Amino acid sequence: MTIMRKTHPLMKMVNHAFIDLPTPANISGWWNFGSLLGLCLIIQIASGLFLAMHYTPDTLTAFSSVTHICRDVNYGWLIRYMHANGASLFFICLYLHIGRGIYYGSYYYMETWNIGIILLFLTMATAFMGYVLPWGQMSFWGATVITNLLSAIPYIGTDLVEWIWGGFSVDKATLNRFXAFHFXLPFXIAAMAMVHLLFLHETGSNNPLGIPSDCDKIPFHPYXTTKDFLGIVLLLAFFFTLVLFFPDLLGDPDNYSPANPLNTPPHIKPEWYFLFAYAILRSIPNKLGGVIALVMSILILALLPHIQTAKQRSLMFRPISQLLFWLLVSDVLILTWIGGQPVEPPXIIIGQIASFLYFAIILVLMPIAGIIENKMLKW
């Protein structure tokens, strides 16, 4: 008798993706973040669904409906904080996943990598629109400032902004459409994640050595499922520590004040996971230039496969490139810190130097390091 998981049309798909999938024997814990991102997405969709049952997307009642969820709904406070901190967790896993991809040269799987970049843009859009929904001060002013950046686009900019707003300012129409998009986009993210997996399974996973591993493959289950399960337990432990003990650690106190179009907060800033890009935006005095730099700070990932000069895929045995990689990580952390600071000296010049370094490391220094390393290895 044949095994059902190998013959049943639905089970066969699951089998090929999660059970009998040939996996490199030497993949490390850095390969856990794909499954953890899947878990984060499930947590966000589930908690978001329950929040949507009690939320009203109206400028007069949005803030009080969130208060009602926290005070009157059974475990509403838990669902709300799980959703808010789940977004932070999502981005922590996302950035670690991308960092792993850069370090081990996973960007050579072009389709998988490009779909990953689309997933990153979709997730950022979803998170931004979700931040607007509680209709606190930072929600309102964040939405106003970030959507207003589109007015820098020549000729169509102003019309585009008013079209997105649904009027001449951020108002009821804006909140309503953001609620609709914020609800619908995660399902598109889930669909794109499936395509991401589809392309990954066409080539098979990369591994820390960055060399073909067809001669040394093991089945995904039970080895990598057990490993993923450990990652999930550790992630949930960290997540619930954050949710139950420090729920407001990553939030902005200004968002506990209802939105007031007549009162601008002293420091308008997005959530922590956008601060590095916000710092790059602010470091360029020209509005259009800033917007281009903002988009390029993410889109630059798409250039990685085309600008690499090294003949080794992974950075594991390339000390100069390793140094540059960790310099890049430090630079992103500095940008994140600067993005949360007010625009005044010395924060301005630090932001400009860090922004310049961000692009210089990726576009200039890493390709040069690759050439030097090739020469050192006499390749």
Curated annotation (Swiss-Prot):
The chain crosses the membrane at residues 33-53, 77-98, 113-133, 178-198, 226-246, 288-308, 320-340, 347-367. CDD domains: cytochrome_b_C, Cytochrome_b_N. Its cofactor is heme b. It is found in: Mitochondrion inner membrane. Heme b b566 binds at H97, H196. Disulfide bonds: none annotated. One of its GO terms (biological process) is mitochondrial electron transport, ubiquinol to cytochrome c. InterPro entries: Cyt_b/b6_C, Cyt_b/b6_C_sf, Cyt_b/b6_N, Cytb/b6-like_sf, Cytochrome_b, Cytochrome_b_C_euk/bac, Cytochrome_b_N_euk/bac, Di-haem_cyt_TM. Keywords: Electron transport, Heme, Iron, Membrane, Metal-binding, Mitochondrion, Mitochondrion inner membrane, Respiratory chain, Transmembrane, Transmembrane helix, Transport, Ubiquinone. One of its GO terms (molecular function) is ubiquinol-cytochrome-c reductase activity. Binds 2 heme b groups non-covalently. GO terms for cellular component: mitochondrial inner membrane; respiratory chain complex III. A ubiquinone binds at H201. The keyword Cell membrane does not apply. It is a multi-pass membrane protein. Belongs to the cytochrome b family. The cytochrome bc1 complex contains 11 subunits: 3 respiratory subunits (MT-CYB, CYC1 and UQCRFS1), 2 core proteins (UQCRC1 and UQCRC2) and 6 low-molecular weight proteins (UQCRH/QCR6, UQCRB/QCR7, UQCRQ/QCR8, UQCR10/QCR9, UQCR11/QCR10 and a cleavage product of UQCRFS1). This cytochrome bc1 complex then forms a dimer. Heme 1 (or BL or b562) is low-potential and absorbs at about 562 nm, and heme 2 (or BH or b566) is high-potential and absorbs at about 566 nm. This is Cytochrome b.
